[in-house]
């Protein structure tokens, strides 16, 4: 498998897991950051792997590169300077490779966060398909026969509501679970 095909495969099958893990570690208010740094890591893989070779565990490499990029960006953000120690404390959770059950728990928590009842159903669906399933904005728009700009706006508004309502990626309580599963 050539590098381009491998990176495409990793994007389709691992990017949601990495986004979920980073969102758990850095908090749901940094969902945009998690998505951006995963894309940065995939780009770095495309740039480096053809020359340096594919690492033994490509998904772990992507996670580490994305985590390090997120830390770099957060450290340089003046408004988050007070959070630097908190972020450093979260690092041990990523130090050892997560088991597949941890990754599944993170993905489920991400899906349940995307399906928070504070978000309109259209936002929940678009955000889940984009963030947890890895579909592009264009793919989501085609599936729902909706203009791509509409889907893009739903995603922006959904992420803004998550940030503004301080919605966390933790699993919901037993009372809140049915409302999210219905979504």
Predicted regions, residues:
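Short, charged helix-capping/linker segments at alpha-helix termini
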Residues: 1-9, 19-38, 48-56, 148-149, ...
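Hydrophobic/aromatic residues within well-ordered alpha-helical segments
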Residues: 11-14, 66
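Hydrophobic-face residues of short alpha-helical interaction/recognition segments
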Residues: 18, 22, 62, 66-74
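C-terminal flanking helix
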Residues: 19, 26, 42, 159-166
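Structural recognition of an alpha-helix C-terminal capping motif at a helix-to-coil junction
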Residues: 36-43, 56-68
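DNA major-groove recognition helix of helix-turn-helix
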Residues: 38, 49, 66, 74, ...
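Arg/Lys-rich amphipathic alpha helix in sigma70-family domain 2
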Residues: 67-85, 164
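Amphipathic helix-loop-helix modules that constitute alpha-helical solenoid scaffolds
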Residues: 85-139, 146-183
């Amino acid at each position: 498998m050539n590098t381009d095909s491998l990176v495409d495969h990793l994007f389709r099958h691992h990017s949601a897991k990495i986004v979920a893990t980073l969102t758990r570690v850095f908090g749901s208010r940094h969902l945009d950051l998690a998505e951006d740094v995963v894309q940065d890591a995939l780009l770095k893989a495309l740039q480096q792997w053809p020359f340096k070779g594919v690492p033994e565990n490509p998904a772990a490499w992507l996670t580490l590169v994305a985590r390090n990029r997120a830390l770099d960006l957060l450290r340089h953000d003046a408004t988050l300077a007070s959070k630097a120690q908190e972020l450093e404390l979260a690092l041990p959770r990523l130090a050892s490779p997560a088991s597949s059950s941890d990754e599944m728990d993170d993905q489920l928590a991400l899906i349940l966060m995307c399906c928070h009842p504070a978000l309109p159903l259209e936002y929940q669906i678009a955000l889940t398909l984009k963030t947890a399933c890895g579909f592009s904005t264009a793919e989501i728009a085609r599936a729902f026969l909706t203009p791509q700009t509409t889907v893009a706006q739903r995603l922006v508004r959904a992420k803004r509501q998550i940030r503004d309502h301080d919605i966390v990626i933790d699993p919901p309580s037993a009372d809140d679970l049915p409302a999210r599963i219905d979504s």
